[in-house]
Amino acid sequence: MAKNAKFRVPFRRRREGKTDFRQRLGLLLSGKPRLVARKSLNNVTAQLMSYDEKGDVVLVSAHTKELVKMGYKGHCGNLPAAYLTGLLLGKKAVKEGAEEAILDKGLHRATKGAAIFAVLKGALDAGMDIPHGDEIIAEEERLNGTHVKNYAESLKEDADAYKKQFSKYLEKGLNPEDLPEHVAELKEKILNL
């Protein structure tokens, strides 16, 4: 390993695969707060963060678990949940007076229609000003869950496959075909906060 002066050990967070310091420096030099969006398999987290010498400060945050408390019955890891999380974060940020930000996607690859960009679209719809390209954001029918509705309708013929695929939706009392209306209701509730 490190036997001579030519070998340089990377920073710990770089070794752990958590931080791209070159990208982080570019974002910090902008002087704007960062919209940090992270997705796991079952949840989406969004935070508005600003730099401080002692460590980053979270100005506002939103999580899909907050959506569940507001009455969301769908899966918390899908695109509609990511969009609603971004909308909730944007609404909170505008109330706090932070209307401008820059997207921090972390180590996620920039893929068209990804959940991180659904969070971005939600924050934009809440009134935030974030530089972006329109081609990277998913279509409106994916953000409101129409693709889930279409898939559920195509699977309806095979009752066993339908019940297996959408068991959690049915358990929570939400018919998957009603997801777009459910998302629209929750969107209205968030916008009226």
Curated annotation (Swiss-Prot):
GO biological process terms on file: ribosomal large subunit assembly; translation
An MF annotation (GO) of this entry: structural constituent of ribosome
One cellular component term from this protein's GO annotations in UniProt: cytosolic large ribosomal subunit
Record has Ribosomal protein as a keyword: yes
Domain of life: Archaea
CDD domains associated with the record: Ribosomal_L18_L5e
Keywords: Ribonucleoprotein, Ribosomal protein, RNA-binding, rRNA-binding
Gene3D superfamilies: 3.30.420.100
Assembly and oligomerization: Part of the 50S ribosomal subunit. Contacts the 5S and 23S rRNAs.
HAMAP family according to UniProt: Ribosomal_uL18_A (MF_01337_A)
Family designation: Belongs to the universal ribosomal protein uL18 family.
Name assigned to this protein: Large ribosomal subunit protein uL18
